[in-house]
């Protein structure tokens, strides 16, 4: 019997919109997690039967969910089951808890003199987050129990902080079912250390940890995030924690809580190099490569590609570029900063304000340094994937300076796509620093002067060294492709 794999995530591999004629038009989902899971599933698909469970995010998605009648649409050959969660429940769970509380927590983003304020409104929102996770747990249990029986081999892969309660809730629904149903949870974010984690209300913080420990395996991109999770389990829950796992080399610890053993593992996500390079040869990307080359006019290019996300640290990156032009005037007229950003989470007030600050600061830098024959900075805030690939291809320097990041795929994709070798200026607070740090220029993301100095060092780096470093970075990114990343998650459930 083929292995059955159930994937659960907030955003799925396909989303729908209504066309002009009222028809439903599907579009492949974006984002690093989605791309990684799709690519990984493609590699294991011949040996597995997969169903992907996700939330309906739009009115069109909800129409599809109702039309499905518990069936599934398909994307990339994967059956997709969308959950029609009430819009107000979804909004509170996604925007008020997942993004405004848990995301801020793990990225250490709270403005603590003012926020957060966990009052009655948050308690209402938390009940919605619980209901949202219950909807996923119920759907996963339905799918799993439909297969339960002799010979059934079912693996559940729960993705990210939106679904931190789902593993425990699923366990409750599987009580008495086949012991061949095993559950994994993977966090694509960092994890907060215990002292910061205690910002959450005590019962909420314990519920999140307890929920994740309903899984047989809990995974992270970097060992430091796994270590912080173990610290929280020990400090907040009083769970029994060991730092040497009983599994494979990717196991960094285990937690015994409520009679269950959970392995804590590390699986860094790299890049599907053949697919990425093939996409970069498409006509739309090549057109952008030519256009960016004309815009550069022979000047050096410092490139960044981000979402307008608070943790991506775009404002300090712009400040570092301004300091470079101020302290190293020899670069005026000889370098251009391409800052390409994707709009992100406009429903969250802090994100709207941050995007406006990015736009304003870019305007100030342009006005301060512009010359008749030179525009020092090109900022575009819109979704344009081909343009982003092209920017990575032509970069002399790639700036990736998040204040905190679970992994960061751009830091890996840039060297893979580079056509002339690029120097990588990388935050030490990105999970990717653990694998790329030897060949990148590591910086403190809060230190604008250090970042400016690293940009200068990258610009003057000898071509041979730049190419050597870029090739080494690309090789590292290729060493953990999505197929291996997802396969390792499945393997961790067999121990």
What does each model-found stretch correspond to?
Residues 1-495:
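Catalytic cores of carbohydrate-active enzymes across secretory and cytosolic contexts
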């Amino acid at each position: 019997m083929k292995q059955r794999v159930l994937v659960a995530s907030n955003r799925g591999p396909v989303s729908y919109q209504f066309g002009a004629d009222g028809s439903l038009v599907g579009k492949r989902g974006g984002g690093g997690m989605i791309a990684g899971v799709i690519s990984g599933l493609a590699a294991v698909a011949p040996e597995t039967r997969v169903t992907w469970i996700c939330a309906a995010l739009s009115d069109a998605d909800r129409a599809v969910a109702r039309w499905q009648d518990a069936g599934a649409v398909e994307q990339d050959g994967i059956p997709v089951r969308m959950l029609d969660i009430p819009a107000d429940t979804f909004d509170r769970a996604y925007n008020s808890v997942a993004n405004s509380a848990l995301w801020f927590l793990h990225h250490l983003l709270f403005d603590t003199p003012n926020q957060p304020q966990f009052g009655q409104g948050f308690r209402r929102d938390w009940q919605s987050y619980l209901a949202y996770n219950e909807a996923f747990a119920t759907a996963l249990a339905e799918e799993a129990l439909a297969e339960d029986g002799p010979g059934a081999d079912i693996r559940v892969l729960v993705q990210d902080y939106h679904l931190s309660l789902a593993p425990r809730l699923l366990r409750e629904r599987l009580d008495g079912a086949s012991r061949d149903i095993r559950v994994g949870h993977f966090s694509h974010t960092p994890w907060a250390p215990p002292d910061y984690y205690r910002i959450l209300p005590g019962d909420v913080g314990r519920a999140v940890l307890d929920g994740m420990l309903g899984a047989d395996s809990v995974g992270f991109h970097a060992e430091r995030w796994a270590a912080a999770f173990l610290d929280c389990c020990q400090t907040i829950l009083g769970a029994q924690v060991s730092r040497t796992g009983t599994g494979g080399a990717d196991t960094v610890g285990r937690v015994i809580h409520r009679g269950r053993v959970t392995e804590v593992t590390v699986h860094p996500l790299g890049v599907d190099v053949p697919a990425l390079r093939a996409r970069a040869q498409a006509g739309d990307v090549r057109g952008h490569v030519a256009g960016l080359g004309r815009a550069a006019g022979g000047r050096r290019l410092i490139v960044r590609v981000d979402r307008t996300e608070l943790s991506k640290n775009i404002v300090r990156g712009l400040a570092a570029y301004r300091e470079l032009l101020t302290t190293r005037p020899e670069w005026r007229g000889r370098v251009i900063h391409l800052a390409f950003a994707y709009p992100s989470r406009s429903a969250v007030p802090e994100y709207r304000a941050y995007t406006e600050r990015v736009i304003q600061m870019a305007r100030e830098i342009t006005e301060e340094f512009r010359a008749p024959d030179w525009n020092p900075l090109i900022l575009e805030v819109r979704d344009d994937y081909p343009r982003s690939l092209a920017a990575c291809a032509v970069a002399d320097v790639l700036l990736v300076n998040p204040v905190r990041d679970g992994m960061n795929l751009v830091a890996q994709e840039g060297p893979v796509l580079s056509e002339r070798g690029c120097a990588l200026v990388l935050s030490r607070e990105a999970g990717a620093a653990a694998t790329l740090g030897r060949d990148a220029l590591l910086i403190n993301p809060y230190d604008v002067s250090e970042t400016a100095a690293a940009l200068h060092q990258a610009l003057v780096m000898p071509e041979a060294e730049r190419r050597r470093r870029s090739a080494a970075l690309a090789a590292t990114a290729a060493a953990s492709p999505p197929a291996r990343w997802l396969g390792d998650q499945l393997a961790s459930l067999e121990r």
